[in-house]
Design a protein with these regions (language model features):
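Lectin-like carbohydrate-binding module/patch detector with strong preference for beta-trefoil
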Residues: 1-73, 78-83
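Structural beta-strand segments of beta-rich domains
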Residues: 24, 241-243, 342-348
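Extended carbohydrate-recognition surfaces in non-catalytic/accessory domains of CAZymes
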Residues: 85-246, 303-304, 309-312, 689
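Extended substrate-binding grooves/exosites of carbohydrate-active enzymes
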Residues: 89-132, 136, 189, 300, ...
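Glycine/proline-rich low-complexity spacer/linker segments in large multi-domain proteins
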Residues: 93-115, 133-137, 263-264, 283-320, ...
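Accessory beta-strand-rich segments of carbohydrate-active enzymes
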Residues: 151-154, 218-328, 353-354, 508-509
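Extended acidic/polar, glycine-enriched regions
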Residues: 282-285, 349-437
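Surface beta-strand/loop "capping" patches
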Residues: 323-355
Length: 689
C-alpha cells in the first residue's frame, strides 16, 4: 500500500501491481479518493491515459539502462533506434582457435526473406516479387544494399593491425586506406596469394590453430587479416524499427563493430551471419567496421578441392522490421501422390525479444503464378514472449505440381498487422508443390521415377574469385538446362540464397551440401569437440533453405571419413525437415545416410550395384572427372543406370574449370597474354610458380 498509509500526498506516489510475466501495472490514488487509477497506452498508441479499470490498464516491463549512455538525438546524429544502447561486451581473439566458439551474438538461422512495410509495397517492387534473386528496390523494401566500395587495409598477420585496438572507432582516420569492391575475394585484388589445394590445408595442420602458412603453396606469412570500413545511413523512417545487418558469406571469420562498439562474431564462410544492431545505430550516418581473418578453426572444416580465398565474398545488406515481428517461416504441405491436392501449413515464428505485451494478426495467402489468390488464413499472436503460430490452408485442389521439367511456382505472402489492424510488415516466398517418395531403392517425384543427371559445382569467378555475381549464376544455370542437366550438387557448401531462387524457377533438383570437409584430417569427424561446429553449419543450411522446392536432398558434407559426429548432424537434419539425407562417407555399417553413395566407381562396379548400394538408393556423387578434359564413358554409365532397379543417378565432377586471372596482372587491367589469349591460371599451375 502507499507507504502503509503514512504518505500524506498519495497522488504523487506510484504503486507497482503485479501483472504476471515480469510485468506490472502502474497505479496511483488521487487525493480524497478511495480507488486507484492505472496508466494505459491510448488507443492510437501515441501517449498515456488513465483508467479506473485494471482490465483496461497496460502492463509495463522494465529494462536496465545506462543514464550516461542513453537516449535522445543530437544535431546530425539522430535518435537511437532502441530504448537502450547495445552492449555485447568485447571480442576475444582466442575464439578463432576454439572449435566450440562458432559465433557470438549472431542471430538464429532462418528462411530467406526481405521485409516490406505492406503487401502493397511488396507487390510494387515487381521485379523482386516475381524474381526473388533480383536486387530489392530500396525505395519500396525495408532494405539497404551495402555492396559496393568499402575502405580496406590488408595486414599479413593477426598480431598487428592498423590501429587494431581503435580502427573500429567512428572517428578513426581511414583516408589512407585503399578502396575495395564488396563482394570480392581480396586475393583477386592482389592482397596476398590465392591458394589452390585438393586435400592439404594451406596452413600447418595443428587443429584448432590455423595460423602458419604453408610454403609449398607459396604462403609463407602468418594468418592474414583484412580490415573493412564504410558508412551506413539509417533513414528516419527506421527510428522505431529493429535493424539487422546481414552477411551472406565471409571467409573465414568476421568481427563486427558499429560506431566503435562490438556487435558480434561469426565463422562458417558459406552460411548467413545476421546481427541485431538496433541498439548500436542512430538515424543518420553510422560507422560500420569489420575485421576478417583469413583462417580460423572453422577453416579445418573448409578443406575442399578448390581455390582458398578470403574476405567478404557475398552480399551485405541491412533490413528493418517492427520491434515484434515474424522472424521465420517454414512451409510444408500434405499432398496426394501426384501433388495436385491437399493442404499447406506455414509455421511462423513471432520474435518478441523485448517481452512486450502485444497482439499481432498474422495472415498467410497463397497465390498462383498469375497472382490470383487461391486461399488465405489468419492466426492471432498475443503475448509477451517469442512464440510459434501455424496457419494451415486446407482443401487445396487443382494444384499444378512442381518438377524440374515443369517448375511451376506459387507465391506465399505473409503479412503482419498491429493491435489496431494497421499493416506493418509483409514478405513473400516462392513455393512449389511436389511429393518426394521412395519405392524400393528408387526415388519418385510426383509419382514419377527421376533420373538425377547432375553436375558438381564450385563458386569460382575468374575476376572476383569466390564472389559470384547474379549474371554468372544465371549463365551457368541456363547453360546447364541446355546441356540437359537437371541436378546440382552444391559441392561442397551452400550457395548464395539467390541461386536457390533461380534453381526453383528454372527447374533443378538440388543436393544441398553442408560446408563440412576435413579431408586432410578426417579424425575431426569422430572428435566430439568438433560436433558443435559441424552441427551449426548443418543446422543453418537446413533452416535457411528448407522452403525451396528445388532442394531434394540434404548432404552432410564431403570426404570427412565416417566419423560418429555425422550421427548428430544426420539427426539434426531429420529433426528439422523430412527430406532424404546423403553422405558419401557413410559406409555400410552406419545409419547416417538415406542413400548409398560413392565416387569414381568403374562401370563394372556400378553394374554390380545396380539394385542399390548398402541396401539403399545408389547415388554416384562424383564421377566422370572432367577438370581440364572432356567427359568420357557417360553412355556406358547411363546404360547401366537407366536399366537398374536401384541407381538414381549421379553428378559429374565438375561443371566448369576452376580458373582465375592472375591477380598480379589483373590489378593492372591485364586479362590477356601477349599473344591475345585470356590469361587464366589453374590452381596447380599457379601454386607451382
Amino acid at each position: 500500500d502507499y507507504n502503509s498509509g503514512l504518505e500524506s500526498n498519495a497522488n504523487q506516489e506510484w504503486k507497482l501491481v503485479d501483472a504476471g510475466n515480469s510485468t506490472y501495472y502502474l497505479a496511483c490514488r488521487p487525493q480524497h479518493s478511495s480507488s486507484d487509477y492505472y496508466l494505459a497506452v491510448n488507443t492510437s498508441g501515441t501517449g498515456l491515459t488513465k483508467t479506473s479499470s485494471k482490465t483496461s490498464a497496460t502492463a509495463f516491463g522494465f529494462i536496465k539502462a545506462s543514464a550516461s549512455e542513453g537516449g535522445g538525438g543530437t544535431e546530425g546524429g539522430g535518435g537511437s533506434t532502441e530504448e537502450t544502447p547495445g552492449d555485447h561486451g568485447s571480442f576475444d581473439v582466442s575464439w578463432i582457435s576454439n572449435q566450440s566458439k562458432v559465433s557470438d551474438h549472431k542471430e538464429d538461422a532462418h528462411a530467406t526473406f526481405i521485409p516490406y512495410a505492406s503487401v502493397e509495397q511488396l507487390k510494387a517492387d515487381a521485379l523482386h516479387y516475381e524474381q526473388p534473386w533480383q536486387q530489392p528496390d530500396e525505395t519500396k523494401a525495408e532494405y539497404i544494399n551495402l555492396n559496393g566500395t568499402w575502405k580496406f587495409k590488408y595486414v599479413a598477420g593477426t598480431s598487428y593491425g592498423p590501429g587494431s585496438s581503435e580502427f573500429q572507432a567512428k572517428d578513426y582516420n581511414d583516408s589512407g586506406w585503399d578502396d575495395i569492391r564488396v563482394p570480392l575475394s581480396w586475393e583477386m585484388a592482389n592482397y596476398g596469394k590465392p591458394v589452390y589445394t585438393n586435400v592439404g590445408y594451406p596452413f600447418s595442420n595443428n587443429p584448432p590453430n590455423a595460423n602458419s602458412g604453408m610454403s609449398q603453396y607459396g604462403v609463407t606469412d602468418h594468418n592474414a587479416t583484412g580490415f573493412y570500413r564504410r558508412t551506413i545511413n539509417i533513414p528516419a523512417t527506421w527510428k522505431d524499427k529493429r535493424v539487422f545487418i546481414h552477411f551472406d558469406g565471409v571467409y573465414s571469420a568476421a568481427v563486427v563493430w558499429v560506431n566503435g562498439k562490438y556487435v558480434g562474431y561469426s565463422q562458417s564462410s558459406n552460411t548467413d551471419a545476421e546481427f541485431d544492431i538496433t541498439g548500436f545505430v542512430t538515424t543518420g550516418d553510422n560507422q560500420l567496421s569489420v575485421r576478417v581473418y583469413r583462417w580460423c578453426d572453422g577453416s579445418y572444416l573448409e578443406g575442399q578441392d578448390m581455390w582458398h580465398l578470403s574476405g567478404i565474398h557475398r552480399d551485405v545488406y541491412l533490413v528493418a522490421t517492427p520491434k515484434v515481428f515474424v522472424s521465420d517461416h517454414y512451409i510444408t504441405s500434405s499432398l496426394n501422390n501426384e501433388a495436385t491436392s491437399g493442404s499447406m501449413s506455414v509455421k511462423l515464428t513471432v520474435d518478441n525479444r523485448n517481452t512486450v505485451s502485444t497482439t499481432k494478426t498474422l495472415q498467410v495467402s497463397l497465390l498462383d503464378a498469375d497472382d490470383n489468390q487461391i486461399a488465405t488464413g489468419t492466426q492471432t499472436y498475443s503475448g509477451t514472449s517469442t512464440a510459434e503460430k501455424t496457419v494451415t490452408l486446407s482443401g487445396l485442389s487443382n494444384l499444378r505440381p512442381w518438377s524440374a521439367e515443369d517448375p511451376y511456382l506459387y507465391t506465399v505472402v505473409v503479412s503482419q498487422k498491429d493491435e489496431n489492424g494497421a499493416e506493418e510488415m509483409a514478405f513473400s516466398t516462392k513455393y512449389g508443390f511436389r511429393n518426394i517418395t521412395k519405392s524400393g531403392n528408387l526415388i519418385y517425384i510426383n509419382k514419377k521415377r527421376v533420373y538425377f543427371k547432375g553436375v558438381n559445382t564450385q563458386d569460382t569467378h575468374p575476376e572476383y574469385g569466390r564472389a559470384i555475381d547474379m549474371e554468372t549464376m544465371m549463365k551457368d544455370l541456363t547453360m546447364m538446362k541446355k546441356a540437359n542437366v537437371n541436378t546440382v550438387r552444391t559441392s561442397h557448401y551452400p550457395r548464395q540464397p539467390k541461386m536457390y531462387a533461380m534453381m526453383d524457377a528454372l527447374g533443378f533438383y538440388v543436393m544441398d551440401e553442408a560446408d563440412v570437409e576435413c579431408h586432410y584430417n578426417q579424425n575431426l569427424s569422430s572428435n566430439s569437440s568438433w560436433i558443435t561446429a559441424m552441427d551449426d553449419r548443418t543446422k543453418r543450411m537446413v533452416l535457411r533453405d528448407r522452403n525451396h522446392p528445388s532442394v531434394i536432398f540434404w548432404s552432410l558434407g564431403n570426404e570427412c571419413g565416417g566419423g560418429s559426429n555425422f550421427s548428430t548432424t544426420y539427426n539434426t537434419c531429420k529433426n528439422l525437415d523430412s527430406r532424404f539425407v546423403h553422405y558419401e562417407g557413410a559406409g555400410s555399417g552406419t545409419n547416417y545416410s538415406d542413400l548409398g553413395s560413392n565416387m569414381y566407381p568403374t562401370v563394372s562396379s556400378v553394374q554390380g550395384n545396380r539394385s542399390g548400394l548398402n541396401g539403399k538408393p545408389y547415388f554416384i556423387c562424383e564421377y566422370a572427372h572432367a577438370m581440364g578434359q572432356a567427359v568420357g564413358n557417360l553412355k556406358e554409365y547411363w546404360d547401366v543406370i537407366e536399366n537398374s532397379t536401384g541407381i538414381i543417378g549421379g553428378c559429374i565432377w565438375d561443371w566448369v574449370d576452376q580458373s582465375v586471372y592472375d591477380p598480379a596482372r589483373l590489378v593492372n587491367g591485364q586479362k590477356k597474354s601477349d599473344k591475345g589469349f585470356n590469361y587464366w591460371v589453374s590452381g596447380y599451375d599457379y601454386n607451382s610458380t
